[in-house]
């Protein structure tokens, strides 16, 4: 069931990412410029009807990978880490669990709104390594895949 929902989400989100210059491949979108590559991925749970929304930032200057994927990114996190409060995060977990609660279309619409209002501005505001290092939205608990040290070296 989660793969069917993932496909519906991909269709709804496609025009938003296309407008940002992202290219779609499978359940992922990516775009790159000289300094950063940005990724967004929809991941279906193997054990339930939950869906995860992964975000990644890759520092191009490292040239570690020619075509980086979300797993290669130096900064990786889930979209709920962009939410402002514990209540918003709890509500998002309920939205992304398609085993219960609101009907599927209502959940998809709410998830689309969160992505438009939280992730799209994040991608729009973060275009350089300096933007990432100086951002209040980038939290210490987000997963840095050796990225913090690299970013600091690249920025200096």
Q: Which ranges hold each PLM region?
A:
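Intrinsically disordered, low-complexity regulatory regions enriched in serine/threonine/proline
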Residues: 1-8, 12, 31-156
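Short, well-structured beta-strand/strand-turn elements
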Residues: 21-29
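Pyridoxal 5′-phosphate
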Residues: 17
